[in-house]
Regions:
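Conserved acetyl-CoA-binding loop-helix of GNAT-fold acetyltransferases
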Residues: 95-112, 292-304
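Non-catalytic N-terminal targeting/anchoring module and adjacent flexible stem/linker
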Residues: 1-18, 22, 309, 323-324, ...
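Short, well-ordered alpha-helical packing segments
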Residues: 67, 87-90, 103-111, 130-134, ...
Length: 373
């Protein structure tokens, strides 16, 4: 049986639907996009970021695998490069041993299309895809997760991830209803804020789109990052559209009459989420500022979400200055919660890697975007 990897098109819609049905029947939790045109950042002429779908089709016309790519202009050491995130690969090999090697073939096909490939996510080194990447010579760069609990009692009672056993549920309920958990969490975040003892004076304004002010900020601060995806106004308006997903709230941050940064935040009421249960989750999914001004942006974004009544605020960050900015607002910084996995070619471009990694800016908007938020 021969298999060809081709761009997803209208002719493959039925075959993708059948592929998804076979995966579901085999017990796989995965599926692929039946619509060949991405809902989010569809390809458009002149756009610096887009998504594209590819399918693995056998000689009978059946789809046996698929993957998505998100190419985007990055600045690496000041030079523009096309760097791509990948989603998948999704293979029938997860339910049928005849296609076990198809996932590796699709990954190699991605690398042929975009050698500067990366993945931003993963839960741990034990995952099969991580083991495969390590064997192929990829590097796993660990990055932290930032968490601020604003409503401790609801956090203790509704956070699904922490309530994984009867004993844990009893302990968390006791902490919530006795008030002990409320006091301890409030004291913990207060102590983290006091450790930095910072005063911030910036203000935030909700705006409907990114304008010339965003371009001016981008050109002013882009050289302060060793590696960063393009965050000019056009790119950000494509990533955070006026309608559709993600429903980002754009905050322009000013200090003494000058724009010093911006943040994109989400306010999401979860329902049956595996991690957050039914919490109301605020998230800082993207942000930009001079590294010296990160604390100002985080502070006003946090205040904005606090006023909206969210239970917690979360963010994934890679750049040490942004991690410090979240810590200055009392966030708990939990290490080694998300991995940046650059291909060997991208890793070579990022050399000296350890030094460049300290200037790498990644947020939830990078990679697949703020999925599940």
């Amino acid at each position: 049986m021969s298999i060809e990897i081709v761009p997803h098109a209208a002719a493959h819609v039925g075959a993708v639907a059948a592929f998804n049905s076979r995966l579901a029947a085999g017990g796989s939790p995965w599926s692929f996009y039946t619509d060949p045109l991405p809902d989010w950042i569809a390809p458009r002429p002149g756009q610096a970021v887009w998504r594209e779908y590819h399918v693995a089709v056998d000689d009978a016309g059946d789809v046996r695998g698929a993957y998505a790519l998100k190419p985007q202009t990055w600045l690496v050491h000041g030079e523009p490069r096309t760097v791509a995130d990948w989603q998948g690969p999704f293979s029938e090999g997860s339910v049928d041993a005849k296609f076990t090697t198809l996932g590796l073939r699709m990954l190699r096909d991605m690398l042929k299309k975009y050698p500067l490939l990366y993945s931003w996510g993963h839960g741990g080194n034990e995952q099969p895809v991580v083991q495969m990447l390590l064997k192929m010579g990829w590097v796993m760069h660990q990055t932290p997760f930032c968490l601020l609990v604003l409503r401790p009692s609801r956090f203790l009672r509704l956070n699904a991830l922490l309530r994984s056993s009867l004993l844990r549920r009893l302990a968390l309920d006791l902490g919530a209803y006795s008030g002990v958990g409320f006091v301890l969490l409030k004291l913990h975040h207060a102590a983290l804020r006091l450790r930095h003892a910072c005063r911030f004076t910036a203000t935030a304004t909700e705006v409907p789109a990114f304008g010339p002010w965003a371009d001016e900020l981008w050109h002013r601060c882009k050289a302060r990052y060793a590696a960063i995806a393009a965050r000019d106004a056009a790119s950000m308006n494509a990533l955070v559209p006026a309608m559709g997903w993600p429903a980002g709230i754009r905050l322009k941050v000013d200090r003494r009459g000058q724009c010093i940064g911006w943040a994109v935040v989400l306010d999401t009421q979860m329902q049956g989420d595996a991690r957050f249960g039914t919490l109301r989750v605020g998230s800082v999914v993207d942000c930009l500022a001079d590294p010296d001004d990160t604390g100002e942006v985080v502070a006003v974004a946090t205040q904005f979400l606090r006023r909206r009544g969210v239970d917690i605020v979360i963010s994934n960050q890679a750049h040490p200055a942004w991690v410090r900015g979240f810590a200055q607002s009392g966030y708990a910084v939990l290490p080694n919660k998300r991995m940046f996995a650059p291909s060997p070619a991208l890793r070579a471009l990022l050399e000296p890697f350890d030094e460049t990694a300290r200037g790498l800016h990644l947020t939830n908007m990078d990679g697949h975007g703020p999925m599940a938020l």
